[in-house]
């Protein structure tokens, strides 16, 4: 298979007008061997390697010679589109003479990513917003949401694929919920009047016949969390942008309790009550009100007794005593409502597809609410039950999927719980969230235990080693790895400059010295700067300070859509673009528009981030270094991604300037630098500014 793959790679590269790349050939060979010998593989492939071809060609060779497709999972929409709209069509054409059959490929996303024609047709209000939710929104929210829903209804009649990611203009999650359903809320294609036109069913049918199925990490997570198959049967998975896998899986497994969602659910349940039966949802509404009032009271009381003024905000290592009974009552009310609605015969709504769908949706939502309450209660007493009937039922409410729920819960293990008072139009939104401490066991058994998995990214070897990423995925240290390198000569094309003379970054914003340093660098570069900041406030403050002292246009994240800002930056060869996390990863601006990447500080996780805090403590308890395993690795990954924005083509040259002396003065600084591209390293500002002036003069 290996020699055949190299032949196919050569054919494809020649057809696409490219040139042979040693790193690409090395990666393609390793991927082919891993698929053939059925072992996992982690590959770091820097910018310019051509990693998508390096894994697609072995995947195509394996899939067209097998009855099973290869699943390719990505973190971002941009990469999914690149694969489906550019790479795979071109490869299908280039390789057609050498393949045993024409290549078939498809994209598959979760059902909730597609508009539901049945839900659109059965909208019950003028605003298009569900009645139960409509009554809880203030006029401005209702107006904005209603306008978006109206636009979605119009789009539903025009779209060819119903895919949310292909909307001409994005909408809020609240608006999208009015026109979509989850897989468990769907009444099924055979019972739905729009079954034959269903966008999700069409996408699933195309995927069932494909050799290569492109999906996202979220759907891959769902496929791992439930026993019912979501993706076509497969035995090989390619995970691109694998550095984001842990976070995406964690996000899917995170749940929350919010007063609004509980109240909406109770109203939805009440609307399903049939004549002569108790009103479903009454007890849930009362329990939700008691829980909300208790939470507000506990928050106010604890805040007044807390000299820091934060009270119960942040991580809970146990449920506050005054909240345990209200939370248990909410759990039991959710279960009772679930039983009430489940007890309504499906035949009751045989001629009403909208209510049939709503019945399933309420059953699913009450089950999830019950499970969330159980997770929060159990997180503070791992290994203990409270003896209640509902506790024994946790994860076993849905009958035909009980085993999957229990197994997934066991694999996710210990949970982390935290409370936030999110700001809202009508005052604070009191939200309690719960997330898994680790997803390693889930990945080990449900992903790696069932498939051959190839994981790849430009950033996997943190501190120069794969050890950290392997541990986060639940893979052993001896898992085969490969650093395919990059065709770019980082040392001769790029400079890493640390402004050691600046004061350490503090909480009071940018120092005068750091603003002056940034201005001198930007002026030397002639603009052409991508500013990566640790927070929105830091980006805004630096932009405000610099706009009075540099003669170049400074574009700021939040002042326009991200795509518009990046396009303006790309076209204007003297502009600067400042922003936060959205710019650290995925921004691709080759050429003369970018010669300076400015980083304000090492992007450690917030010290009050409950999940990161819990993971650090867990690492310490295992005898490791929580700071290095969690905080330093988090920072190293982002620093590597951020620095990787500089060299995007073989002709690019420039400077990565870090305004944080700790990258040089602290012990962990060397570890983070080893995670970054191998640029020439200096502490001399005059040398760097001279290099930037020469680049500006030659552009």
Question: What spans do the regions from the language model cover?
Answer:
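Conserved RecA-like ASCE P-loop NTPase motor core of nucleic-acid helicases/translocases
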Residues: 69-78, 454-456, 527-534, 657-659
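Conserved helicase motor "Helicase C" RecA-like lobe of SF1/SF2 P-loop NTPases
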Residues: 534-558
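A substrate-engagement module of RecA-like helicase motors
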Residues: 2-14, 67-211, 303, 336-342, ...
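Signature of the SF2 helicase/ATPase Hel1-core->accessory helical subdomain module
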Residues: 55, 61, 81, 85-89, ...
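A contiguous, basic/glycine-rich beta-loop/short-helix subdomain that forms a polymer-engagement track
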Residues: 177-211, 226-228, 337-502, 508-516, ...
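Conserved pre-motif I regulatory segment
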Residues: 1-43
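Walker A/P-loop
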Residues: 37-57
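Conserved RecA-like P-loop NTPase helicase motor core
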Residues: 499-509, 560-664
């Amino acid at each position: 298979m290996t020699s055949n793959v190299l032949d196919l790679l050569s054919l494809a590269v020649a057809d696409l007008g490219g040139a042979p790349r040693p790193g690409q050939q090395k990666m393609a060979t390793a991927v082919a061997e891993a698929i053939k010998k059925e072992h996992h593989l982690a590959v770091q492939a820097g910018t310019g390697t051509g990693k998508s071809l390096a894994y697609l060609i072995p995947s195509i060779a394996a899939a067209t010679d097998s009855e099973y497709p290869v699943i390719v999972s990505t973190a971002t929409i941009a990469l999914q589109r690149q694969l489906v709209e550019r790479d795979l069509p071109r490869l299908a054409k280039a390789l057609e003479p050498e393949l045993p059959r024409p290549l078939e490929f498809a994209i598959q996303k979760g059902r909730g990513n597609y508009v539901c024609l049945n839900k659109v047709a059965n909208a019950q209000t003028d605003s298009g917003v569900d009645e139960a939710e409509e009554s809880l929104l203030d006029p401005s929210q209702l107006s904005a949401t209603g306008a978006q829903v109206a636009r979605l209804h119009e789009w539903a009649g025009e779209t060819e694929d119903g895919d949310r990611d292909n909307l001409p203009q994005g909408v809020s999650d609240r608006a999208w919920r009015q026109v979509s359903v989850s897989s468990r809320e769907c009444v099924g294609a055979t019972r739905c009047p729009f079954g034959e036109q269903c966008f999700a069913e069409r996408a699933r049918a195309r995927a069932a016949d494909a050799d290569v199925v492109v999906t996202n990490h979220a759907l891959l997570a769902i496929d791992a969390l439930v026993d019912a198959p979501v993706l076509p049967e497969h035995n090989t998975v390619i995970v691109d942008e694998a550095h984001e896998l842990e976070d995406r899986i964690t996000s899917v497994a995170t749940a929350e309790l919010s007063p609004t969602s509980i109240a909406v659910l109770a109203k939805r349940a009440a609307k399903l009550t049939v004549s002569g039966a108790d009103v479903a949802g009454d007890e849930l509404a009362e329990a939700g009100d008691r829980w909300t009032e208790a939470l507000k009271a506990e928050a106010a009381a604890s805040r007044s007794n807390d000299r820091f003024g934060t009270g119960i905000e942040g991580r809970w290592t146990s449920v506050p005593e005054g909240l345990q009974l209200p939370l248990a009552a909410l759990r039991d009310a959710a279960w009772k409502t679930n039983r009430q609605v489940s007890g309504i015969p499906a035949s009751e709504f045989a001629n009403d597809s909208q209510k049939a769908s709503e019945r399933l949706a309420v059953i699913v939502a009450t089950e999830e609410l019950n499970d969330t309450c159980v997770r929060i209660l159990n997180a503070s007493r791992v290994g203990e039950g409270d003896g209640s009937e509902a506790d024994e039922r946790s994860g076993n409410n849905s009958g035909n999927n009980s085993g999957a729920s229990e197994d997934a819960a066991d694999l996710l293990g210990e949970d982390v719980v935290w409370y936030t008072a999110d700001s809202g139009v009508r005052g604070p939104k009191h939200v309690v969230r719960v997330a898994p401490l680790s997803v390693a066991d889930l990945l080990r058994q449900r992903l790696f235990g069932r498939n051959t998995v190839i994981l790849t990214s430009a950033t996997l070897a943190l501190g120069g080693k794969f050890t950290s990423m392997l541990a986060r995925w639940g893979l052993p240290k001896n898992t085969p790895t490969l650093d395919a390198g990059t065709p770019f000569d980082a040392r001769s094309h790029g400079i890493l400059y640390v402004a050691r003379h600046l004061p350490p970054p503090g909480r009071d914003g940018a120092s005068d010295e750091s603003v002056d340093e940034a201005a001198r660098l930007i002026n030397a570069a002639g603009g052409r700067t991508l500013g990566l900041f640790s927070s929105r406030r830091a980006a805004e403050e630096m932009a405000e300070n610099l706009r009075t002292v540099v003669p170049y246009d400074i574009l700021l994240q939040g002042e326009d859509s991200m795509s518009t800002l990046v396009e303006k930056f790309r076209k204007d060869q003297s502009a600067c673009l400042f922003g936060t996390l959205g710019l650290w990863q995925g921004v691709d601006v080759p050429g003369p528009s970018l010669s300076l990447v400015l980083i304000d500080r090492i992007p450690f996780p917030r010290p009050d981030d409950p999940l990161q805090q819990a993971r650090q403590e867990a690492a310490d308890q295992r005898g490791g270094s929580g700071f290095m395993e969690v905080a330093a690795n988090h920072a190293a990954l982002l620093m590597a991604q951020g620095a990787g924005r500089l060299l995007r083509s073989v002709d690019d040259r420039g400077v990565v300037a870090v305004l944080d002396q700790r990258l040089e003065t602290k012990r962990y600084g060397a570890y983070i630098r080893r995670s970054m591209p191998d640029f020439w390293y200096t502490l001399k500002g005059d040398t760097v500014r001279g290099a930037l002036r020469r680049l500006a003069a030659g552009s």
